């Protein structure tokens, strides 16, 4: 009896989530204009640039190595900053918990068009356990890597805003040109 009830409840859960259009977030569908681009960075083999490159590949973006090409869009990773602020302290005044902040600055250069700035900020908290000093360093490295991967995912998702702002700009230009043509 319990097995049938469990199967019924599981089936209802599947039907409800399928019926409402819920789906897990997969890879980002990058706009057609950005399916091929140049990835330009001051540290091309650094961990952040590698994370961005991996996210672009997961989104089926072809990365061109020739940074001098002017005919295809370019994603420039301008830089990143990591800060660490104290969130809480122990009774003896030592730091108990940090808030780590990673900010990534980038820009997209569209050939013959504008430069679109992108900024991504990722927050994480980190508990500083004074009894496990060696494990603390390893855990902090893992948290930093996860923050880089999350920032890279957000950066690739923000490429959609470049496409959206281009469409708005094109609509405004066509509206202005049709308004000027009707006045003439």
Curated annotation (Swiss-Prot):
Q: What does this protein do?
A: Together with LptD, is involved in the assembly of lipopolysaccharide (LPS) at the surface of the outer membrane. Required for the proper assembly of LptD. Binds LPS and may serve as the LPS recognition site at the outer membrane.
Tell me how this protein sits in the membrane. Lipid-anchor
In Swiss-Prot or TrEMBL terms, this protein is called: LPS-assembly lipoprotein LptE
Matching NCBIfam families: PRK10796.1 (NF008062)
List GO terms (cellular component aspect). cell outer membrane; transporter complex
Task: Please state where this protein is localized.
Answer: Cell outer membrane
How does it associate, per the subunit comment?
A: Component of the lipopolysaccharide transport and assembly complex. Interacts with LptD.
Q: Which chain positions have N-palmitoyl cysteine-type lipid attachment? A: 20
Q: Which residues form the signal peptide?
A: 1-19
Against Pfam families, the record matches this protein to:
LptE
User: What are the UniProt keywords, alphabetically?
Assistant: Cell outer membrane, Lipoprotein, Membrane, Palmitate, Signal
The record's similarity note reads: Belongs to the LptE lipoprotein family.
Q: Which GO terms describe its molecular function?
A: lipopolysaccharide binding
Q: Which GO terms describe its biological process?
A: Gram-negative-bacterium-type cell outer membrane assembly; lipopolysaccharide transport
What domain of life does the UniProt record list for this protein's source?
Bacteria
InterPro entries recorded: LPS_assembly_LptE
Q: Where is the lipid attached (S-diacylglycerol cysteine)?
A: 20
Q: Which organism is it from?
A: Pectobacterium carotovorum subsp. carotovorum (strain PC1)
Keyword check for Lipoprotein, yes or no. Answer: yes
């Amino acid at each position: 009896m319990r097995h049938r009830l469990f199967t019924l409840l599981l089936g209802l859960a599947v039907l409800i989530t399928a019926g409402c259009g819920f789906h897990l977030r997969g890879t980002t569908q990058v706009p057609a204009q950005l399916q091929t681009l140049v990835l330009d960075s001051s540290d091309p083999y650094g961990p952040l640039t590698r994370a961005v490159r991996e996210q672009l590949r997961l989104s089926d973006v072809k990365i061109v190595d020739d940074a001098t090409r002017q005919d295809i869009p370019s994603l420039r990773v301008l830089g990143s900053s990591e800060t660490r602020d104290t969130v809480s302290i122990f009774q003896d005044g030592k730091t108990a918990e940090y808030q780590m902040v990673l900010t990534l600055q980038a820009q997209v250069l569209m050939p013959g068009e504008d430069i679109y700035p992108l900024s991504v900020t990722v927050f994480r908290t980190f508990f500083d356990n004074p009894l496990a000093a060696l494990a603390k360093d390893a855990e902090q490295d893992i948290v930093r890597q996860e923050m880089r991967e999350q920032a890279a995912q957000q950066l690739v998702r923000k490429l959609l805003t470049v496409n959206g702002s281009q469409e708005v700009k094109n609509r405004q230009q066509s509206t202005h040109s049709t308004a000027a043509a009707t006045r003439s």
